[in-house]
């Protein structure tokens, strides 16, 4: 009997472990099972993963892939997941081409061309933060060169995803966390989690992959070679092709003298060259094209990708356990997070290399190449602060307030007008000892103290001063750059101000370097063109129109000025403008990665949503109070839930019921106290009555005692 029980327990535990194992682990078991059974390699070039379309980087897996059926490609060469299908090329598709890329603006990726060219609001910056793009742009501008690219591409399979597949367990869990925050009205935390989702899974989902290999040579040759050469563009591409053939041994039997003459001038003007073997065997000098092709079979990689935006896959079909309206809110929140990622990595500026206003860091042209710079006077900055909550010992405004050195107060000097740049709430957590009296039955009381965590809040309002009329020369402040805790001052290449300048504090951690010394400070002075933020434009763009018509200012820089990031303050981008050509040297900046929103120090009060109704199809979802899972509600359940929320008219509301309960408890306590007091009083009165009666008849008691004694002695 004991053996039977042990067997049952063993299989129960085994079943629980199997059912409780994450899908990712189940997938690994399936892969190994198929490899052992079929003795075939697994196709590693698979769609269904996340993709960062700014950096051209593969991200976390979005779609779930399983190997329960041990499927293979049509040619039986590779094991593939159940959720994908392949389109094999019946014959080897070997392609060789040469091209000239005169400008970085029309550069196309070798391995992600299709997904980079998808049309969207921010498609102009797709791939602009990839390693290959930044390398090419830097070399073109540094060497004043153009780029030639020769490549041999061998396509083996096109791998596509099945539209009916499911979301990966980890990705789905993060979506459920976002939905839980949204349904409980914790919007700020939901935004923060959505930005973390973009950080982990990218901006798109790969739906199709071209599997194969590519051998690529990129040369950078002086731009003057193409301009001064009597040869045509086709002759230059032919020279690039011949240079590639010299690198990769094509084993041509004939070698013409004209080929040597044609390539000699090309090679003498080459400033940089790189050969990449993407897939196949590693490249080495002298490798033959035949040897490289023969090594492709077991070394397939993705040589092109197609995909759709991440939020496209957040729909009711993918999340059937959630109410449709809630799924739409999750999708919109993720879409907004992706757009914010694109926005904070868009660098407007002049992209014309021949313009004096050229901005090396700009990745989108804003039409500023033709503008002429105007000298503007800078009236300083200041910041006001109001404490909203917190202990007396937690004074937030002491480090948030900043007076204008030109006035010594929170104001602008004469002839200048204040521009409110941004208003935000600053939060800081603190602990303090909180004591209160705790009583039982209103009689037994004691003092209870506990360490309580609370959040102090203060509102700060940042202003800068713009000239509203003609001001005297040298009346404002000199601008010497700025820096924050996460950025350096381009004037000093450090988190500091130039000599003769002092910092003014703005926002929570921005330092603006200014000087009032026009003799010593002019050496490091930078022509300043104003501030603007996500909420307020720059009045210097067209001051006459803004002042006369009262229309909102444009969020851009005046002509002759270039835009630069000051900081991202809790999801809001603040930019400043300096003379074009300054602060644009050095290397290209890396991508600014999310999250950009600061998570709340304490969770907001939850609204505990229990019913979601879809107005489009009149369907309602109810959240189970025990399992916290959503399900479609029946009419009877809906009426019962509505009665629980709003009351049925015959009962008491939650507050009324609490009041009645408290009242009854108090009355009972009073009654019990009075009863105890009355009982004690009654007993005391009874004792007093007996004593009085005894004092009135003392003789009776004495006679009785004597008689008793006599009776006791008479027999003697």
Swiss-Prot record:
A molecular function GO annotation: wide pore channel activity
Example GO BP: adaptive immune response
Transmembrane segments: 113-120, 127-132, 235-244, 248-256, 656-676
Any GO CC annotation of this UniProt entry: phagocytic vesicle
Region named P2: 413-656
Keyword Transmembrane: yes
Positions of the record's site feature: Cleavage: 352-353, 357-360, 631-632
Record has Glycoprotein as a keyword: yes
Complex and partners: Homooligomer; predominantly forms a homooligomeric arc-shaped pore complex instead of complete rings of 16 subunits.
Its biological purpose: Pore-forming protein involved in both innate and adaptive immunity. Plays a central role in antigen cross-presentation in dendritic cells by forming a pore in antigen-containing compartments, thereby promoting delivery of antigens for cross-presentation. Also involved in innate immune response following bacterial infection; shows antibacterial activity against a wide spectrum of Gram-positive, Gram-negative and acid-fast bacteria.
Protein name: Macrophage-expressed gene 1 protein
Annotated gene: MPEG1
């Amino acid at each position: 009997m004991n053996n039977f029980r042990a067997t049952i327990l063993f299989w129960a535990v085994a079943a629980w472990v199997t059912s409780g194992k994450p899908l990712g682990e189940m997938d690994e078991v399936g892969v190994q099972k198929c490899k052992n059974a079929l003795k075939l390699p697994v196709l590693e070039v698979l769609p269904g993963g996340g993709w960062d379309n700014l950096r051209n980087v593969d991200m976390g897996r979005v779609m779930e892939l399983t190997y329960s059926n041990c499927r293979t490609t049509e040619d039986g060469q590779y094991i593939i997941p159940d959720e994908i299908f392949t389109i094999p090329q019946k014959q080897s598709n070997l392609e060789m081409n040469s091209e000239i890329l005169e400008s970085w603006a029309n550069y196309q990726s070798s391995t992600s061309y299709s997904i980079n060219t998808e049309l969207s609001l921010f498609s102009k910056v797709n791939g602009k933060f990839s390693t290959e793009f930044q390398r090419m742009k830097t070399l073109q501008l540094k060497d004043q060169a153009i780029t030639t690219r020769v490549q041999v591409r061998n396509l083996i399979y096109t791998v596509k995803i099945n539209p009916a597949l499911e979301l990966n367990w980890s990705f789905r869990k993060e979506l459920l966390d976002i939905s839980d925050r949204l349904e409980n009205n914790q919007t700020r935390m939901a935004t923060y989690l959505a930005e973390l989702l973009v950080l982990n899974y990218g901006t798109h989902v790969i739906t199709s992959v071209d599997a194969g290999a590519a051998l690529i040579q990129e040369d950078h040759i002086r731009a003057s070679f193409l301009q001064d050469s009597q040869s045509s563009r086709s002759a230059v591409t032919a020279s690039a092709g011949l240079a590639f053939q010299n690198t990769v041994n094509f084993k041509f039997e004939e070698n013409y003298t004209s080929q040597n003459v044609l390539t000699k001038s090309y090679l003498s003007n080459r400033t940089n060259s790189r050969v990449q073997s993407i897939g196949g065997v590693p490249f080495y000098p002298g490798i033959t094209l035949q040897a490289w092709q023969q090594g492709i079979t077991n070394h397939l990689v993705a040589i092109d990708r197609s995909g759709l935006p991440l939020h496209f896959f957040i729909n009711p079909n993918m999340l059937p356990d959630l109410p449709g309206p809630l799924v739409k809110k999750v999708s919109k929140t993720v879409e907004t997070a992706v757009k914010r990622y694109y926005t904070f990595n868009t660098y407007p500026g002049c992209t014309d290399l021949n313009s004096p206003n050229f901005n090396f860091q700009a990745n989108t042209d804003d039409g500023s190449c033709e503008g002429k710079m105007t000298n503007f006077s800078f009236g300083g900055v200041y910041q006001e602060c109001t404490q909203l909550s917190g202990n007396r010992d937690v004074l937030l405004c002491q480090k948030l307030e900043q007076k204008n050195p030109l006035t010594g107060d929170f104001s602008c000097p004469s002839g200048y007008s204040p521009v409110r740049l941004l208003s935000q709430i600053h939060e800081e957590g603190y602990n303090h000892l909180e004591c209160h009296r705790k009583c039982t039955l209103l009689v037994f009381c004691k003092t209870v103290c506990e360490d309580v965590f609370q959040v102090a809040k203060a509102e700060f309002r940042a202003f800068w001063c713009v000239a509203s009329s003609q001001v005297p020369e040298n009346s404002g402040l000199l601008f010497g750059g700025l820096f924050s805790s996460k950025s350096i001052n381009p004037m000093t290449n450090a988190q500091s101000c130039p000599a003769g300048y002092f910092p003014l504090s703005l926002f929570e951690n921005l330092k603006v370097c200014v000087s009032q010394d026009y003799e010593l400070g002019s050496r490091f002075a930078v022509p300043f063109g104003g501030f603007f933020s996500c909420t307020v434009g720059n009045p210097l763009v067209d001051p006459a129109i803004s002042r006369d018509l009262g229309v909102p200012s444009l969020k851009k820089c005046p002509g002759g000025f270039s835009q630069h990031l000051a900081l991202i303050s809790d999801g809001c981008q603040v930019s400043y403008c300096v003379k074009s050509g300054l602060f644009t040297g050095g290397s290209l900046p890396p991508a600014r990665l999310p999250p950009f929103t600061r998570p709340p120090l304490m969770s907001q009060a939850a609204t505990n949503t229990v019913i979601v109704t879809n107005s489009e199809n009149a369907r309602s979802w109810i959240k189970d109070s025990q399992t916290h899972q959503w399900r479609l509600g029946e009419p009877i359940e809906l009426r019962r839930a509505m009665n629980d929320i709003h009351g049925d008219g015959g009962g008491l509301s939650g507050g009324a019921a609490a009041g009645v309960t408290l009242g009854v408890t108090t009355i009972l306590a009073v009654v019990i106290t009075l009863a105890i007091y009355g009982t004690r009083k009654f007993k005391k009165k009874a004792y007093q009555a007996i004593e009085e009666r005894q004092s009135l008849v003392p003789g009776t008691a004495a006679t009785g005692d004597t008689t008793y004694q006599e009776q006791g002695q008479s027999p003697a």
